[in-house]
Swiss-Prot record:
Belongs to the ATPase C chain family. Keywords: ATP synthesis, Cell inner membrane, Cell membrane, CF(0), Hydrogen ion transport, Ion transport, Lipid-binding, Membrane, Transmembrane, Transmembrane helix, Transport. GO terms for cellular component: plasma membrane; proton-transporting ATP synthase complex; proton-transporting two-sector ATPase complex, proton-transporting domain. This is ATP synthase subunit c. Its main location: membrane. It comes from Campylobacter jejuni subsp. jejuni serotype O:2 (strain ATCC 700819 / NCTC 11168). Pfam families: ATP-synt_C. F(1)F(0) ATP synthase produces ATP from ADP in the presence of a proton or sodium gradient. F-type ATPases consist of two structural domains, F(1) containing the extramembraneous catalytic core and F(0) containing the membrane proton channel, linked together by a central stalk and a peripheral stalk. During catalysis, ATP synthesis in the catalytic domain of F(1) is coupled via a rotary mechanism of the central stalk subunits to proton translocation. It comes from the Bacteria. Coiled coil: none annotated. The record marks 89 as: Reversibly protonated during proton transport.
């Protein structure tokens, strides 16, 4: 146990004694942040678009089924459907805005 503790202490001392080049390290961190921002933007927008498409499909199917059961309610159902589709599409647009912020105005990137 003493050998392991001594080895850990020796490695820690070497790590703390090493000189660091902060601008180079920050640039490397910025590269990783940019890479993960691209991944997050693509994945987030893809999931939002998939969820929006599923929601719109279910909304249209329910409206068509309701109109088939009661044709007299068709115009009211269509109005309600268009409002629901606008709300669903707004969620996808919000995801697009967040993705664009992550790509072009990332607050986590430190400028030098």
């Amino acid at each position: 146990m003493k050998k392991v503790l001594f080895l850990l202490l020796a490695c820690t001392a070497v790590a703390f004694a090493a000189e660091t080049n902060a601008p180079v390290e920050q640039e490397a961190i910025n590269v990783w942040i940019k890479a993960f921002s691209v991944l997050a933007a693509g994945l987030g927008l893809g999931v939002a678009a998939l969820g929006g498409a599923i929601g719109m499909g279910n909304t249209a199917a329910a409206t068509i089924a309701g109109t088939a059961r009661n044709p007299g309610l068709g115009p009211k159902l269509m109005t309600t459907m268009f409002i629901a589709l606008a709300m669903i599409e707004a969620q996808v647009i919000y995801a697009l805005v967040i993705a664009l912020i992550a790509l072009y105005a990332n607050p986590f990137i430190v400028l030098q």
